[in-house]
Curated annotation (Swiss-Prot):
Annotated GO CC locations: bacterial nucleoid
Role, per record: Involved in DNA repair and RecF pathway recombination.
Family statement: Belongs to the RecO family.
Keyword DNA damage: yes
Source species: Jannaschia sp. (strain CCS1)
Protein name (record): DNA repair protein RecO
Cited InterPro entries: ARFGAP/RecO, DNA_rep/recomb_RecO_N, NA-bd_OB-fold, RecO, RecO_C
Length: 244
């Protein structure tokens, strides 16, 4: 059994004295583990950096075996954003959330393409807004997507101001009424119209709610990866510095 594909390196852990087990995310194979012989060596360390894009060949005697990888570096991303702490935190968050969320060996070609785009845009203008859109796409792929097309209560499409924390559907200001304080605010950033970083943080609070209270329980109630909170903290510090 074998296949070859470009993949995004999500995680690396030591295996024995000299090898490593890596987790790759590819378009057609999904999240797929494999052993890299000699992966713990100094020679391989620059290749096996989380977020790197690798040309990988996987081989195993049987399809249900963990198998082994041979890899070549296509694009190393961590070194490119090493001087940008916020972008580096974004890289870590993307990889950690994918490893946390995706089942093994299930293909998500659309999410793979979107992930490549958001990683390639790290540090660019409006990348944080693109990251928010990526989290929304992840929720959709996992079956917990937001529906911001119309009010869940009345069907109107104007003056949508809130989101139901239970269903992820939009609610108009008029329909919310006295229940408004129990709903999540609909940040313009969730519709691609962020006015500034505060809107993006408000949007991430919404996606964070659904990641923590809907997705995580479906995966055995595991806590969200700490890397995501480190990104939120980094973005908040950036806002504070910008306003000082």
């Amino acid at each position: 059994m074998d296949w070859r594909a470009d993949g995004i390196l999500l995680a690396v852990r030591r295996h024995g004295e000299a090898s490593a087990i890596i987790e790759l995310f590819t378009a057609d194979q999904g999240c797929h583990l494999g052993v890299v012989r000699g992966g713990a060596s100094r020679k391989m360390a620059p290749l096996l950096q989380v977020g790197a894009q690798l040309d990988a060949t996987w081989r195993a005697r049987l399809s249900d075996h963990i198998g082994s990888y041979t890899v070549e570096l296509v694009k190393g991303r961590a070194a490119e954003v090493m001087e940008d702490r916020v972008a580096l935190a974004g890289l870590s968050s993307v990889c950690a959330l994918l490893s946390f969320s995706l089942p093994e060996r299930a293909a998500y070609p659309g999410l793979f393409a979107r992930t490549l785009a958001v990683l390639d845009g790290l540090g660019a203008e409006r990348w944080a807004e693109a990251y928010l859109g990526w989290e929304m796409a992840l929720l959709t792929e996992m079956g917990f997507g937001l529906d911001l097309s119309q009010c869940a209560a009345t069907g109107v499409t104007q003056d949508l101001a809130f989101i139901s924390p239970r269903t992820g559907r939009a609610v108009s200001r008029a329909a919310a009424g006295e229940w408004a304080d129990r709903l999540l605010p609909l940040s313009p950033a969730l519709e691609g119209m962020a006015r500034g970083p505060e809107d993006i943080l408000a949007g991430l609070a919404v996606t964070g709610h659904f990641l923590a209270t809907h997705l995580a329980p479906s995966l055995g109630d595991k806590p969200l990866p700490a890397a995501r909170q480190r990104l939120i903290d980094a973005l908040e510090r950036q806002v504070i510095r910008g306003g000082s």
